[in-house]
């Protein structure tokens, strides 16, 4: 079973759309222990500096990137389960994305889809996929084949 308390999301920018915020809150209630840190929009350099101050050296860093590795929901659940409860930090860029140097620091880069999404929707999708991964590893009814 996934231990969500080992996961953190660093997201650049505020959620402005109410319906997205409501969706995020719904999943966060189902994922107690998942930490979400929101960083103010700024230049990529300032955002990178802030992110580097937040993360620690023992964290497994995953950046969301359209060129990252794609997984099915079951593959993602398996990859997370095989991380053996490492502290995993997911980083979602703002409107300008993440700097290449920050992406290069990542242990791996994750693509949620070959499509490009606004950062607000990417945050909702990631949190939903973490909930789905937890349900898959628990054998719960949420994930349908």
Swiss-Prot record:
InterPro entries found in the cross-reference section: Alpha/beta_knot_MTases (IPR029028), RlmH-like (IPR003742), tRNA_m1G_MTases_N (IPR029026)
MF annotations from Gene Ontology: rRNA (pseudouridine-N3-)-methyltransferase activity
Assigned EC number: 2.1.1.177
List of residues binding S-adenosyl-L-methionine: 64, 93, 112-117
UniProt subcellular location: Cytoplasm
Chemical reaction(s) catalysed: pseudouridine(1915) in 23S rRNA + S-adenosyl-L-methionine = N(3)-methylpseudouridine(1915) in 23S rRNA + S-adenosyl-L-homocysteine + H(+)
Keywords: Cytoplasm, Methyltransferase, rRNA processing, S-adenosyl-L-methionine, Transferase
Predominant location category: cytoplasm
Cellular component annotations (GO), alphabetically ordered: cytoplasm
EC supergroup of this enzyme: transferase
Recorded family membership: Belongs to the RNA methyltransferase RlmH family.
Subunit details: Homodimer.
Function (record text): Specifically methylates the pseudouridine at position 1915 (m3Psi1915) in 23S rRNA.
HAMAP family, alphabetized: 23SrRNA_methyltr_H
Protein name, UniProt field: Ribosomal RNA large subunit methyltransferase H
UniProt gene name: rlmH
